């Protein structure tokens, strides 16, 4: 009796070691072998695979410049390869937040780009926020279609870490620009955004880029119940976003009679990479944007890492200063103390394991140090 030849699996047919996950799946359903072979033949290697076979299951992130907002987003900031929307009223800090994200990407050796559809980009303000102007790409497109085409080309290059579009409301379709003022152009911008999202989503997912859309708010007419607020550009952006951040100004910061900043509340109204509806509050100064050290003091006090007695701030046996401003300056001048507080705050929030050294390990380290000193 002639034995039937064994059907080769997609990986085995090429002499490649079979992934354990794929092996388990094929043992459960042998009939999948032919289907998987056909899929890989038609669409190439890696067109379908077990999730565990992926080399990377964690999502890389870029910090927002605010530790409380990073924690609200899931611990590390905004995710790469995803679409993010930052929206809110005028002068709430949307562009400042987006530029801080760009500055943080540059600090880690990345490249940031801004597509300035509003034609209102201020280089001097960006520099104060820590943005390196020499490595910042800036484009001021003449139409919405041009802006989205530039964005698509930057994403497909896989060389840009953050692409900021400022703003969705200013992405004017070409037909509207070529028409007369007063002409009706119903749904043109929503159609532009819908088509752009369909084209961009796949390319963004395969890249290292985080695309940040800044958006304004409008009010719907005749709404009796619920919030009348909405954002321009239709519903497509809301659906395709992985994170949506609602930024609001909730108070003023004063030095005597002079207003030196504002208190900002950011609510994560949508999050596909962490639990949504978390809220972060932080200070945004008029001199240099988000106060990282001020935010760290608030979080440290809240998580009992930093003790506050009256107006004095104390970390362990170290007095940080009397008053928040002096304590903030102390942390700026002592980055090692600031980093230590940051790690303990993250550990208290459950985002990293607390740094602990066993007694045996510390004794070994001392002995090693003595041996080196005596040699």
From Swiss-Prot:
ATP binds at residues 88-95. Keywords: ATP-binding, Cytoplasm, DNA damage, DNA recombination, DNA repair, DNA-binding, Nucleotide-binding, SOS response. Belongs to the RecA family. It is found in: Cytoplasm. InterPro entries: AAA+_ATPase (IPR003593), DNA_recomb/repair_RecA (IPR013765), P-loop_NTPase (IPR027417), RecA-like_C (IPR049261), RecA-like_N (IPR049428), RecA_ATP-bd (IPR020588), RecA_C_sf (IPR023400), RecA_monomer-monomer_interface (IPR020587). One of its GO terms (biological process) is SOS response. GO terms for molecular function: ATP binding; ATP hydrolysis activity; ATP-dependent DNA damage sensor activity; damaged DNA binding; single-stranded DNA binding. PANTHER family: MITOCHONDRIAL DNA REPAIR PROTEIN RECA HOMOLOG-RELATED, RECA. SUPFAM superfamilies: P-loop containing nucleoside triphosphate hydrolases, RecA protein, C-terminal domain. Can catalyze the hydrolysis of ATP in the presence of single-stranded DNA, the ATP-dependent uptake of single-stranded DNA by duplex DNA, and the ATP-dependent hybridization of homologous single-stranded DNAs. It interacts with LexA causing its activation and leading to its autocatalytic cleavage. One of its GO terms (cellular component) is cytoplasm. This is Protein RecA. Gene3D superfamilies: P-loop containing nucleotide triphosphate hydrolases. The lineage of its organism: Bacteria, Pseudomonadati, Planctomycetota, Planctomycetia, Pirellulales.
